[in-house]
Amino acid sequence: MGIKIGLVSLGCPKNLVDSEIMLGILKKAGYEITAREKEADVLIVNTCSFINDAKEESIRTIIELARNKINGRCRAILVAGCLAQRYPAELMAEMPEIDGLVGTGQVPEIARAVRRVLEGGKVLLTGSPGYLHDAYFPKVLATPPYTAYLKIAEGCDNRCSYCVIPAVRGPFRSRRMEDIMSEAEELANKGVKELIIVAQDTTRYGIDLYGKPMLDALLEGLTGIKGPVWLRLLYTYPSLITDDLIYLMAKSRKICRYLDIPFQHASNRVLQLMNRRGSKEEAARLVAKLRADIPGIVLRTTFIVGFPGETEEDFQELLDFMAEAKFDRAGVFTYSREEGTAAAEMPGQVPEEVKLLRRERAMMLQQEISLQKNLKRVGEVIEVLVEGKSLKGRGMYTGRSEGDAPGIDGKVFFKSGFNLQPGDFARVLIKGGTEYDLTGETVL
């Protein structure tokens, strides 16, 4: 019987791509991949450390998986990803459950790490995070077969005062356009219907290689690939959304009328403290332009509340902006004080209970906005990517519209007399809506 490897991927889709590459490398090296923890000889946790909640989830997962050393056949626990990159000494000193660490820059060395821990050694592979994968890296997709993430760059050159990403992921570095196209064509040949383009900052794509933003040129090339029906953009930085990109999105039916734009706040004073480029006024103009030039576009954003120095007036300014902009989707997070960041040392740290109350108030406002927007869609016929049968009843299915990214947005629950399969597209008449989801039935 061969050596079996299990992997748990935590955090964002960018981390999931690293997990897919690690699985591909291990499979190519002759290891068997298993989803059953108790069957694995080696268990890998690809961790996140972006905010405190993510760190706690990573540590909990490591402890839970380590129980398989007693109750299963597990011989070693490997920790990979951002937590390993950020806290190597602390993890090895304080968590004896861990047999090895693989940092964000050492993904290609995962097979060597597995080999070493199986021999009984301890492994510490953390160094400068300069790794950048290409189309030749083997991958095992961890997504449903009709959807895939396409990571076009690594690292980040933005220096937001609250963020550890540049420290754990390194400087921004783009993949070559022809290399991305090659991977996209391979995914299309495998039957992928939805390509989701990700990076720490997708709109910065190409600046380091070509001297200017090239996301629009990349997208134009991707629209020419036969196969994928939807191209979806995540993690766009507002100040780099160009007129050329907007024009391309408006004219191409392959690019989802959907943009994920983390504005983070609306008080210019707080934005300055966050070291974010742009202002509330520029954000408002961008939102208006996107809606005017791309009718029906769905806009998702994220905001941070309780940032150091945020006053009640600053927070009210954010609420007013949310009420005026009426984003289709919004995530609201409480500020997480991360050591090593400029914001962690700022005066005016906001008490935790105030942060939580502000988050609740912002989310209540957004839920009402989302509900009203969804109810206004009743009577529309939309295209839905079928994800499978729903447990809500006989003949019920679940899927997503072009306005719904997997894992972060809502669903469409619908009834159909057709025998639909995951990855099919269906035309659905919307008959109802909640804060997050739509309901309906298929039409011819």
UniProtKB/Swiss-Prot annotation:
[4Fe-4S] cluster 2 binds at residues 156, 160, 163. Residues 375-444 form the TRAM domain. GO terms for molecular function: 4 iron, 4 sulfur cluster binding; aspartic acid methylthiotransferase activity; metal ion binding; protein methylthiotransferase activity. Pfam families: Radical_SAM, TRAM_2, UPF0004. It comes from the Bacteria. It is an enzyme of class 2 (transferase). Residues 3-119 form the MTTase N-terminal domain. Keywords: 4Fe-4S, Cytoplasm, Iron, Iron-sulfur, Metal-binding, S-adenosyl-L-methionine, Transferase. The keyword Zinc does not apply. Its main location: cytoplasm. Residues 142-372 form the Radical SAM core domain. SMART domains: Elp3 (SM00729). Binds 2 [4Fe-4S] clusters. One cluster is coordinated with 3 cysteines and an exchangeable S-adenosyl-L-methionine. It catalyses: L-aspartate(89)-[ribosomal protein uS12]-hydrogen + (sulfur carrier)-SH + AH2 + 2 S-adenosyl-L-methionine = 3-methylsulfanyl-L-aspartate(89)-[ribosomal protein uS12]-hydrogen + (sulfur carrier)-H + 5'-deoxyadenosine + L-methionine + A + S-adenosyl-L-homocysteine + 2 H(+). [4Fe-4S] cluster 1 binds at residues 12, 48, 82. It is found in: Cytoplasm. Its cofactor is [4Fe-4S] cluster. NCBIfam families: 30S ribosomal protein S12 methylthiotransferase RimO (TIGR01125), MiaB/RimO family radical SAM methylthiotransferase (TIGR00089). This is Ribosomal protein uS12 methylthiotransferase RimO. It comes from Pelotomaculum thermopropionicum (strain DSM 13744 / JCM 10971 / SI).
